[in-house]
Design a protein with these regions (language model features):
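Flexible, low-complexity linker/hinge segments
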Residues: 114-123, 260-282
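Conserved AMP-binding/adenylate-forming core of the ANL superfamily
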Residues: 142-193, 213-222, 274-277, 297-306
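Conserved adenylate-forming
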Residues: 221, 229, 241-260, 355-501
């Protein structure tokens, strides 16, 4: 005989859930806007965006608090789809109980012979991909963790074939050599093939971040109109959800002629007539984050990129036995150049997961390193902080991070406190303290500028000091004043960097 709760008991339980949920939402809203403490009112139909002003990171924090309070596991897409606390309530009521992950079988690729792994004479990214296709076309280049699906393996040959179809589609739609094509796509196979396909068509890719939430597509596009106009983008490659609304951009971006999806590009059947790229040709436009002003487009040539990729590889001593595990967005230089294009050049596999997967489940990054025996990974400081503050011990049982030899920490200020907390906590799971590698870079240098010596423990010093790190061998630098004279010592410093990249 089973005991079913009465209707009144069920109603009481739901009301308690509502009360706790609204309390969590209001508490976070107050923390974000303490000056409006008394005026913040939260109902089941309050808009998370308009009324409570929750951005993507605020939503991530809210998910952590809800899961902890109710002991449930919310779906990853929840971050993008929830619009009100009522949506949160439905998700909590439908969510399964949270379960600890189990250790997954390891995935390994056979190492390549040293003479087969690196295209030393390649002069462009086209040369790099074609070289690998000639040497080991079926070797797995990318392990892609797509939402709701099993891991997808993409070989060098598969990437080139897919990219060539995209290139034909772009040519048929009028993309001219040297013209820019903006990519507003989420992490996935489409992004990789459309990026390479644009280059094969003779165009210049312009990576842009996709809208985080569907209800905000129009606002997102409006904010990007200035970048699209500045880039003289004649083509926008995006998702079917964005495509209809993106047509509104044509009045704000005079050069915009084509708005197309990856599926439409792949429908072309003609043979690709290849174009010859030169080292000095533009490979893509990398827009800065805009943290110090309006985002600026940085022109990166094939020569720039290959110089920086080779310099970074030399500093950290990579080879084809390495594995790069990344959740970093592909519109950011650390994710695009450091993770993907670096792995493309050096023939070590890239394990790619979406930023949303990491933000909702930070432990998924660590488990991917465990499963694939990852040796290299990277994150801004906040990613390491999330692993320290938002991952419970129960979610780490059986985790082994002993393979992780290079943990880049950059793209934002590095916190000594975070470095200490992360290394101390995860040394219990095999992470080596000397694997933490604080780095400095900027889009104008393609990516990397300074790196500490490999194998050295992080040095945390609070005295006023000028030497910050060693540059790569191909990146000489000096410290100067505003008047460009050599300076030593000083309080206010400028870095004058001269680089091929």
């Amino acid at each position: 005989m089973s005991l079913q709760p009465s209707k009144s008991q069920a109603d009481e339980g739901e009301q308690q859930t509502v009360t706790v949920l609204l309390g969590l939402v209001r508490q976070l809203a107050v923390e974000l806007q303490p000056q409006h403490n008394r005026s913040i009112t939260v109902t089941l139909d309050s808009s998370l965006d308009r009324d409570l002003r929750f951005d993507s990171l605020s939503r991530v924090e809210l998910v952590f608090r809800i899961e902890h309070a109710f002991g449930v596991s919310l779906p990853e897409q929840f971050l993008a789809t929830a619009e009100t606390p009522r949506d949160l309530l439905r998700a909590v009521q439908r969510a399964p109980s949270e379960t600890a992950p189990t250790a997954a079988p390891e995935v390994r690729l056979a190492p390549l012979e040293e003479t087969q792994s690196v295209p030393l004479n390649a002069r462009t990214l086209h040369d790099v991909l074609e070289w690998h296709c000639e040497k080991h076309s079926t070797r797995t280049h990318i392990y892609l963790y797509a939402e709701g699906r099993e891991v997808e393996e993409i070989s060098y040959a598969a990437l080139l074939k897919d990219a060539e179809r995209v290139a034909v589609g772009l040519r048929e739609r009028g993309l001219q050599p040297g013209h820019t094509a903006a990519l507003m796509l989420p992490t996935g196979r489409d992004y990789f093939s459309c990026f390479i396909g644009t280059m094969l068509a003779g165009g210049v890719p312009v990576p842009l971040y996709p809208p985080a939430r569907l209800p905000q597509i129009e606002d997102h596009l409006r904010r990007h109109a200035r970048i699209l106009s500045n880039a003289l983008a004649s083509t926008l490659i995006t998702t079917p959800e964005v495509q209809p609304i993106a047509r509104l951009l044509k009045s704000q971006v005079p050069e915009m002629r084509t708005i197309v999806t990856p599926a439409e590009l792949r429908s072309a059947e003609a043979e690709l007539i290849k174009t010859s790229a030169q080292p000095g040709d533009i490979a893509f436009l990398q827009y800065t984050s805009g943290s110090t002003g309006i985002p600026k487009g940085v022109v990166l040539t094939h020569a720039n990129l290959l110089a920086n990729i080779r310099a970074i590889g030399g500093v950290i001593q990579v080879d084809s036995t390495d594995v790069f595990v990344s959740w970093l967005p592909l519109y950011h230089d650390m994710g695009l150049i450091g993770a993907w294009l670096g792995s493309l050049y050096f023939a070590y596999p890239l394990v790619k997961m979406s930023p949303v997967k990491f933000l909702t489940r930070p432990q998924s990054w660590l488990w991917a390193i465990h499963k694939h025996r990852g040796t290299i990974s990277a994150s801004p400081n906040f990613g390491y902080e999330l692993c320290v503050s938002k991952v419970r011990d129960a979610a780490l049982e059986g985790l082994d991070l002993s393979s992780w030899r290079v943990a880049f920490n950059g793209a934002e200020p590095v916190s000594p406190k975070t470095v200490r907390r992360f290394t101390e906590r995860f040394c219990e799971y095999g992470f080596k303290k000397e694997s933490m590698v604080p780095v400095y870079g900027l889009a104008e240098s393609s990516l990397g500028v300074t790196f500490p010596p490999m194998g050295r423990l992080p040095i945390i010093d609070r005295i006023q000091r000028e030497p910050l790190a060693r540059s790569g061998r191909a990146t000489p630098l000096r410290i100067v004043t505003r008047m460009r004279s050599n300076l030593w010592p000083a309080v206010s410093l400028y870095l004058a960097i001269r680089f091929v990249s």
